[in-house]
């Protein structure tokens, strides 16, 4: 049996690449920083049985047309809105992702962003570096709110939402959460948690942190109408997906003082242009989509992405299948290439 041919759109951490090379013929786009051009992607995918891609790669019908042998798309990400899932399913192409392995990293980073924006840590650093610390200590200098006793609103209570709630509970806060269903199992473990509707969460929370996937339903979930419901003393945190927040409405909210500030790791446009309006606010902390950027998490993501891809080519159920409907279109035994 011929070895499967795999295209990897970026150099990924070990042990992911080594795992693939043990059982597949692998072509790698030799860059850590830049994705392949559209032309390069279409050219390299032609004879491949499998694709390992990143969220920077748009995988649509055109790509699938260029790859008639394609059996599995393994994305090195939790989100998969960069892949046309219905199209892949229709063609019998398995799509997998990497949930769970970056949960702790993103939850830790979320707490870090909350502290950074509320306690004005980035603003303080900038003041020292630009020579503006030119006055004696005074009791009002760079003050911000404590977390203790505050109400934290979590929009979405999946793996990352739960992990964030666990960490925040140690600050002696009240946690409101909104999700498509009530999580009794979590409420029994984490103290001071309350299930509520989205509008109530926005109206009562001192900090609103977003933890939902990007879908048609969550696109611009946080829009002008909902931003206006937040307290003027509240902060918005987003480590989920950029388009969940209407950027134009958020800029307006910050300019007009509807909210106290924001901390963002994701954006509707990535990379964010250096002259973007969001870069002009001292009460906004910005990060370049690095919430999962721990050494350990990125290694686990690579390993899971490789395991997903290899499992499908072995005719086995992958650890994290996105489109379960594909099993009815093309059973796993029909895509088996690795003994």
From Swiss-Prot:
Positions annotated as active site in the UniProt record: 241, 270, 289 (proton donor)
UniProt keyword annotations, A-Z: Cytoplasm, NAD, Oxidoreductase
Known EC number: 1.1.1.26
InterPro entries named among the record's database cross-references: D-isomer_2-hydroxyacid_DH, D-isomer_2_OHA_DH_cat_dom, D-isomer_DH_CS, D-isomer_DH_NAD-bd, Glyoxylate_reductase_GyaR, NAD(P)-bd_dom_sf
Main location: cytoplasm
Catalysed transformations (reactions): glycolate + NAD(+) = glyoxylate + NADH + H(+)
Binding residue positions for NADP(+): 157-160, 239-241, 289-291
Location(s) in or outside the cell: Cytoplasm
GO cellular component: cytosol
Any one GO MF annotation of this record: hydroxypyruvate reductase [NAD(P)H] activity
Annotated Gene3D superfamilies: NAD(P)-binding Rossmann-like Domain
Family: Belongs to the D-isomer specific 2-hydroxyacid dehydrogenase family. GyaR subfamily.
Subunit description: Homodimer.
Protein name per the record: Glyoxylate reductase
Naturally occurring in which organism (per UniProt): Thermofilum pendens (strain DSM 2475 / Hrk 5)
